[in-house]
């Protein structure tokens, strides 16, 4: 497996001319906790699906979501990253999948559309835990309705030991198309509660040993792996982590109905480091004649 820290630098250099440009002028709002079994406004447009085609069939592979990291060099702006479970980018033999597409909402039509995803070799892994099942890439799809999750809304982004309480309400999102005659994008919300807040070692199919918490949500479909999991934390919802639908515990009756959650600190470590590298790269490029400029 490639070294993550090298991947960060390589990704920043390779993508800077395309995604300098993945900077938002305004950071998204923090999600507020509403009544039970409701999804706070502003969170449903952070999710996207990962699919591939087999003949005329569309195969659901996994789920991804967007995160916004404030730029330290350019106050008031944020870098936008697409995040998913790393194993979604690999086939059953551990090799990079080909032909992966991102499904998300078109801002003009409101319908689901498909955009090609960069190959696995362009994605960045956690610089501290290269085997953690997380991968990210700078990406701001043109003409798409997205609302990235602010870095400050990731549980444990400031305190790595922060964790939710047992029984706290959670929900996770997956992308879907609804409607027969008039198709439109919808983020499907599934609800549950925190079952095991303290992470424990668990084997994830396709990703090896991972440190996961658990939610009780009646079982999760395989394509939901990579989905953002939100937990009620006081007066707001925070990102608890990445859903892991396929673990070695799925066949254990003791853990029936539970799904794993990779803690959000792995996401925070990855995207924060990417933001630092992109900040430095953009600052250097701005000093070079003809280099990419940061939008005013």
Q: Residues of each region from the PLM?
A:
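Beta-propeller and closely related beta-sheet repeat lectin domains
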Residues: 62-63, 225-227
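A short, hydrophobic, proline-anchored segment that marks a local hinge/packing element in signaling
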Residues: 66, 228-231
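Bacterial N-terminal signal peptides
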Residues: 10-25
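Protease-domain processing segments flanking chymotrypsin-fold serine proteases, especially trypsin-like
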Residues: 26-76, 291-296
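C-terminal subregion of chymotrypsin/trypsin-like serine protease catalytic domains
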Residues: 40-43, 230-296
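Positively charged n-region of N-terminal signal peptides that target proteins for export
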Residues: 1-4
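Serine endopeptidase catalytic core focused on the charge-relay Asp
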Residues: 45, 52, 60-61, 69, ...
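Short beta->alpha transition motifs characteristic of CBS
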Residues: 84-88, 174-176, 191, 239-249
């Amino acid at each position: 497996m490639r070294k993550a820290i090298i991947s960060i630098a390589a990704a920043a250099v390779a993508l800077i001319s395309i995604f300098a440009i993945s900077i938002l002028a305004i950071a998204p709002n923090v999600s507020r906790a509403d009544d039970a079994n409701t999804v706070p406004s502003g969170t449903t447009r952070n999710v996207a699906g990962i699919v591939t085609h087999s003949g005329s069939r569309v195969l659901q592979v996994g789920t991804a979501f967007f995160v916004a990291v404030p730029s330290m060099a350019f106050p008031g702006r944020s870098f936008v990253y697409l995040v998913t479970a790393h194993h979604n980018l690999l086939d059953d033999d551990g090799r990079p999948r080909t032909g992966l597409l991102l499904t998300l909402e078109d801002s003009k039509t409101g319908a689901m559309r498909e955009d090609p995803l960069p190959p696995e070799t362009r994605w960045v892994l956690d610089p501290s835990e290269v085997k953690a099942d997380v991968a990210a890439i700078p990406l701001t799809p043109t003409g798409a309705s997205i609302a990235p999750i602010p870095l400050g809304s990731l549980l444990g982004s400031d305190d790595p030991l922060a964790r939710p309480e047992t029984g706290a309400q959670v929900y996770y999102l997956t992308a879907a198309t609804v409607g027969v005659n008039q198709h439109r994008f919808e983020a499907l919300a599934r609800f549950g509660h925190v079952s095991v807040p303290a992470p424990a070692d668990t084997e994830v199919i396709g990703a090896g040993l991972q440190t996961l918490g658990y939610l009780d949500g009646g079982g999760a479909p395989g394509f939901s792996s990579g989905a953002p999991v939100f937990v009620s934390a006081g007066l707001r919802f925070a990102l608890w982590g990445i859903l892991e639908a396929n673990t070695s515990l799925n066949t254990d009756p003791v853990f029936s109905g539970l799904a794993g959650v990779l803690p959000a600190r792995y996401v925070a470590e990855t995207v924060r480091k990417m933001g630092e590298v992109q900040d430095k790269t953009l600052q250097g490029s701005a000093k070079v004649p003809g280099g990419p400029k940061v939008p005013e």
